[in-house]
Amino acid sequence: GLKGAEITFPFISVGATEHALLTAVLADGETVLNNAACEPEIIDLADCLNAMGAKVIGAGTSRISIIGVSSLRGVDYSVVPDRIEAGTYALAAATVGGRVKLSNICKDHLGALWPLIEQAGAKLTFNKTSVLIERNSTKLKAVDIDTQAYPGFPTDLQAQFMTMMCLAEGTSIIRENIFENRFMHCPELSRMGADIDVRGRE
């Protein structure tokens, strides 16, 4: 069977952390994951696994320890709201303007996004689990972004933010620091009239 091991990821990866976590919970002995991803989804996965009988410690930090167990049990579990989905709708609302309320969100999971939407010209009003996005006659302003591992700006919202910046006054610089070839949407935006110049990762 599988045996616990110490694993150091060469770079931060959500998918790699999740796969190692899922495998380690049923391995014999202790597994330690170094340079692990810290995203909310990692914490949520660990919480779910622990509810099922796993022994996961340190999720949400760069070092996760897992003590293998012989079996897991079924549970009822509600997953965390999807922050990328929330961010996509928020950016869509800010882009087209008007007044849109998003419910069942985790504000803290998108801490890097909200200030940038406000800098771009939208007004945000938060309640406990909702946000109201408003932009009427205010013109969008150019904002620069750098994608980063959590809690930085999510690479999965880079294309949506770029789309909003296509309608902004001024020049925006968008740097993609997570994935190569993550500007595949640029030619399509250019076909629709956007003025985009891609140079390497920006």
Predicted regions and their residues:
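Structural preference for solvent-exposed beta-strand-turn elements
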Residues: G1-E202
